[in-house]
Amino acid sequence: MDLMSLTAVELGKKIQAKEVTVEEAVKAAIASIKAKEEKINSFVTIDEEGALKKAAEVQAKIDAGELKGALAGVPVAIKDNMCTEGLLTTCSSKILYNFIPTYTAEAVKRLEDAGCVIVGKTNMDEFAMGSTTETSAFGATKNPWNTEHVPGGSSGGSCAAVAAEEVPFALGSDTGGSIRQPSSFCGVTGIKPTYGTVSRYGLIAYGSSLDQIGPIAKDVTDCAIILEAIASYDTKDSTSVNRDDLKFTEALVDDVKGMKIGIPKDYLGDGLDPEVKSAILAAADELKKKGAVVEEFDLGLVEYAIPAYYVIACAEASSNLARFDGVKYGYRTKEYTDLHNMYKKSRSEGFGPEVKRRIMLGSFVLSSGYYDAYYLKALRVKALIKKAFDDAFAKYDVILGPAAPTTAPKLGESLSDPIQMYLGDIYTISVNLAGLPGISLPCGMDKNGLPIGLQLIGDCFKEKNIIRAAYSFEKTRELKRSTIAEEYSNKNTADTNKSAGAQ
């Protein structure tokens, strides 16, 4: 049996039933990663030794009856912008090529407490700045459905690892769509929770007012269970919200009768690929058949989301990334004349072009002559976008639309046109600006065999609504396996049959 073809919950059940040991699960993940990495490059670091050591510890706790949760013993991959004590954490940047944290991010720690085993850190756009996972200092990640295409970003490594069945699930972060857009491109399911639901402690910041950690998995059930495990109030994160409604698995009910679902007309206009539009409207019809009330409405302000986002996110990035100067950790230039020259050369050599572009943009909009004209104006637009969503959620339980305007572009297409790359997040960015929860899940395939993602958006702290709608829609479809996953599975079957024949 190919253990990595199972969902996290299915694998967890087999481990609890003693059908599979934790060591077997971890070894299966490591073997799968090693077999596929040359083709997709979804990992920056593979921690085989640490994972096997942890597997033995977790197995002992399971055998002693101390660990009984759904995720106990399940291998997981972590996006490389979350601190992991003693394990290299690079943000896919040259400037952090040798950074080993002395503490673990709260969300990661909660997974470890649940008995999950970290097998490695996944590739990403450098400092989460990008939508294709091509800005990584460690090379581009490829899409497991077609390796000539991008996996999306910035959590492209995590999404590709799940789609390729290297691991059952992974953690990603979402600042402007970085979980939902690559989930769409890779045909997996990903949730960006309400801002403040999952602790940002230990997440290396890009845009502090926008960043959120969330799960990436094969299906909605896994995502709900993982989100339940990582969501918590954390005093170490000043933006953490003390919620009492974190039982997200309660929403795993196939019932949308009477649910009011709105489709913004703004999401169906120019720039949306016809095949994507057709798949999204077909998904809406499926929910309608199940009893949901579906109608189109005018959301407004969508065209202002991208400029407002890039002003705010880049301003916050220019401040957050000022700490990387080559003094106490990370990359330091070899030759310099004085301290100022060392700062300048270390940052110039350590950061990639997209990161430098955003730092410069952020520094510009925060400068004294332009602060009011750009940054304050962007904050006002952010408030107006939140108001537009508030008005919509006074009428609707869920907003439905595409996760991305197209399916995955080819490698290199977006890098040559940064504006086009930014426009790829047009349907996800406003959700971050408003602090709302969103989920992306597969809803179809285009003529080239690339996945199309459906996005469901909920009101603040109403993750249960989007999980219920997503779960109900998912029941109308069969999960599909990526090309890379199928190839590996077929090869394993052929090898097994060949071995049996030889005997």
Curated annotation (Swiss-Prot):
<feature type="active site" description="Charge relay system">
    <location>
        <position position="154"/>
    </location>
</feature>
<keyword id="KW-0648">Protein biosynthesis</keyword>
<feature type="active site" description="Charge relay system">
    <location>
        <position position="79"/>
    </location>
</feature>
<dbReference type="GO" id="GO:0030956">
    <property type="term" value="C:glutamyl-tRNA(Gln) amidotransferase complex"/>
</dbReference>
<dbReference type="GO" id="GO:0005524">
    <property type="term" value="F:ATP binding"/>
</dbReference>
<dbReference type="InterPro" id="IPR023631">
    <property type="entry name" value="Amidase_dom"/>
</dbReference>
<dbReference type="Pfam" id="PF01425">
    <property type="entry name" value="Amidase"/>
</dbReference>
<keyword id="KW-0436">Ligase</keyword>
<dbReference type="InterPro" id="IPR036928">
    <property type="entry name" value="AS_sf"/>
</dbReference>
<comment type="subunit">
    <text>Heterotrimer of A, B and C subunits.</text>
</comment>
<keyword id="KW-0067">ATP-binding</keyword>
<feature type="active site" description="Acyl-ester intermediate">
    <location>
        <position position="178"/>
    </location>
</feature>
<dbReference type="InterPro" id="IPR004412">
    <property type="entry name" value="GatA"/>
</dbReference>
<dbReference type="InterPro" id="IPR000120">
    <property type="entry name" value="Amidase"/>
</dbReference>
<protein>
    <recommendedName>
        <fullName>Glutamyl-tRNA(Gln) amidotransferase subunit A</fullName>
        <ecNumber>6.3.5.7</ecNumber>
    </recommendedName>
</protein>
<dbReference type="GO" id="GO:0006412">
    <property type="term" value="P:translation"/>
</dbReference>
<comment type="similarity">
    <text>Belongs to the amidase family. GatA subfamily.</text>
</comment>
<keyword id="KW-0547">Nucleotide-binding</keyword>
<dbReference type="GO" id="GO:0050567">
    <property type="term" value="F:glutaminyl-tRNA synthase (glutamine-hydrolyzing) activity"/>
</dbReference>
<comment type="function">
    <text>Allows the formation of correctly charged Gln-tRNA(Gln) through the transamidation of misacylated Glu-tRNA(Gln) in organisms which lack glutaminyl-tRNA synthetase. The reaction takes place in the presence of glutamine and ATP through an activated gamma-phospho-Glu-tRNA(Gln).</text>
</comment>
